[in-house]
């Protein structure tokens, strides 16, 4: 167990840094946006989308992880700002023990992993929807529920695995800061944060290409075409999410991982590390983008289809033009 100690000069400078404080305010703004946009995102997913229930369950789970992450990270950001504004002259009380921070850190790591695992779960679910001969309501619900449980389990053990044998005898400025004795696991953690989103992105693109080709093979079968349209729209949204989240996760995992390596090799100073790392920590932005991107994608899809139908009903067409218009509407 760590004993209470005064903050080092470096930690004092970090707490006083306007760079560090501005980053916390921006993160809090992301948190507020997440909370405000989650409810309309849920309403759209449940009532206005073409998603099957298996897809809806995993999307709702992603939103749950995003909001839970923002709650716990927001508590730490507010604590940091309180220390900055009211405790700058009391540097023997601003540090926290790693052992006391462990419960918060487990949730932060677990929910971060949960957002990533849920995307992988969506890829598996979309693969099932694409290749299973019959993917009706009952089967899709069983598959979706099973994947949701597995994702939740993986998320719940992520934080525990990260610090399971760490003595947690150090001091940190905030509970979102990783323990110093778990350095060896950083590389594994950041590798997972890069490889899984890249895998998700690759699979989603392949599925989208496959579904588009399959749609045209059944273009004169209205029922089959409509069912495939549902799959394509759902997969397109998942692909859109995967690409957006991959970019931010890549910045986070590669950027922070590289900074930690440079710091460990004494190539950069702790001050330089502290200056840069706050702008590479993109997880609050990822959590914020989940509901925003869902709202954008679902509304855009509905708007495009409505405009196409309105245009279709206003035009008098020949049989050839009618077939061409039908092809465009379903593409």
Curated annotation (Swiss-Prot):
Ranges annotated as spanning the membrane: 26-46, 58-78, 104-124, 142-162, 189-209, 238-258, 275-295
Pfam family of the protein (one): 7TM_GPCR_Sra
Gene Ontology annotations of biological process type: detection of chemical stimulus involved in sensory perception
Superkingdom per UniProt: Eukaryota
Main subcellular location of this protein, as a coarse class: membrane
Stated family: Belongs to the nematode receptor-like protein sra family.
Name the UniProt record assigns to this protein: Serpentine receptor class alpha-9
Record organism: Caenorhabditis elegans
Gene that this polypeptide is encoded by: sra-9
């Amino acid at each position: 167990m760590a004993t209470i100690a005064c903050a080092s000069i470096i930690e004092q400078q970090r707490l006083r840094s306007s760079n560090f404080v501005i980053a916390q305010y921006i993160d809090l703004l992301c948190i507020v946006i997440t909370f405000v946009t989650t409810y309309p995102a849920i309403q759209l997913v449940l009532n206005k989308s073409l998603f099957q229930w298996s897809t809806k369950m995993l999307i709702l789970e992603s939103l749950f992880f995003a909001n839970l992450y923002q709650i716990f990270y927001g508590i730490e950001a507010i604590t940091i700002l309180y220390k900055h504004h009211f405790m700058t002259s009391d540097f023997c009380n601003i540090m926290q023990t790693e052992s006391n921070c462990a419960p918060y850190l487990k949730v932060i790591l677990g929910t971060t992993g949960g957002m990533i695992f849920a995307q992988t779960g969506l890829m598996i679910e979309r693969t099932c929807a694409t290749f299973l001969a019959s993917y009706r309501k009952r089967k899709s619900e069983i598959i979706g529920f099973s994947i949701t449980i597995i994702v939740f389990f993986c998320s719940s053990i992520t934080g525990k695995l990260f610090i399971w044998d760490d003595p947690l005898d150090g001091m940190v400025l905030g509970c979102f800061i990783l323990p110093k004795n778990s350095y060896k696991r950083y590389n594994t953690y950041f590798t997972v944060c890069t490889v899984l989103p890249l895998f998700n992105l690759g699979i989603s693109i392949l599925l989208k290409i496959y579904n588009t080709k399959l749609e045209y093979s059944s273009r004169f079968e209205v029922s089959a075409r409509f069912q495939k349209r549902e799959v394509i729209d759902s997969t397109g949204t998942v692909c859109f999410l995967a690409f957006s989240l991959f970019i931010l996760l890549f910045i986070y995992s590669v950027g922070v991982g590289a900074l930690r390596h440079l710091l460990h090799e004494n190539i950069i100073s702790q001050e330089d590390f502290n200056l840069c790392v706050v702008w590479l920590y993109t997880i609050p932005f990822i959590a914020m983008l989940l509901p925003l991107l869902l709202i954008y994608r679902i509304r855009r899809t509905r708007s495009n289809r409505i405009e196409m139908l309105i245009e279709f009903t206003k035009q008098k067409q020949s049989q050839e033009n009618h077939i061409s218009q039908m092809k465009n509407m379903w593409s």
